Amino acid sequence: MTTRSVVVKVGTSSVTDATGGVDHSVLGDLAGDVVSLMRQGWEVVVVTSGAITAGWAEVGGGRSRPHDAVTLQAVSAVGQPLLMSAWRDAFARQGVAVGQVLLAPLDFSNRGQYLHARSTLAALKSLGVVPIVNENDAVADAEIRFGDNDRIAALVANLVAASHLVLLTDTEGLFTADPRLDPGATLIEEVRAFDATLLALAGSSISGVGSGGMASKLAAAHMATWSGVTTVIAPARASAPLSSSLAETSGFGTIFRPRPERLSARKAWIAFAVASTGTVSINQGALQALEHHGRSLLRVGVTGHTGTFEDGDAVDVLGPLGEVVAKGLVRVGAENFDDGDDVVIHRDDLVLLRRP
């Protein structure tokens, strides 16, 4: 894994101003921060939001976002070139070129597309070009699009084997309570494990102009830490926010430590990039074999299945109490489940999800 590689995601409320247009001042400051790190030997990938909001402002729509899918896709097509032009200008002032990379769910769920995307990003970085990533909103299927760039940023961090993921946003980090409602809320500076209490701290987006919010950032941090990526949620409009995040400046943002046992790139891809198409329920004996002995899932331990999955599809594995305990790629389809191979999911294609 590259030890000095970071993916930085910048939210809509940070890259746009009060009118909804691109905030060139913020982009200029961030570009300077990125280039400073590059000169110190860091590889940087930028994931940017803001195309929809910028496009909506360009066509006279005002600050609030539209809600119907067709309009969202249309204004994204208007805003994306505005956003890229602003990023290009910001980095050009630093003497650095940028390259646009538009990604869709298929680029992560299809193994071939996944590898092509990785090669493209690697080639851009080898040329000294900063990749600027966004979801391909203009043509994405409304039913399968990610809808927020926090998850994309976590997947990109896995894709490029980054050591760090920095989510720059309109808050100071994760607080003990909603600071808008509780004046006694304090910043949580470090998180070492995810639990229900932590996830309950997520609220809605403060700005109201993006599609993310703290819940999506926590989900992205959860994904990234499973991939062995140190993650930081920090304020975008602070001075040198990316450098401060990587330096772990005291009192700046919230840092999420990675799990001690990081997933391999392939297993992280199975766990987080591929959508499940069904479920397979197992008994207690099978659960013990998976969690304590590292075995493959055999048909004898299966108590039922749902969905229309085919050979090679991803499914959620449910324990005796109905909880998701693992995820994997099946070796037999739902239609011929009882007649196929005794191995339902090989251990090389299985990711356990209950280990701390």
Predicted feature descriptions by range:
Residues M1-A97, V101-P356:
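C-terminal catalytic "cap/lid" subdomain
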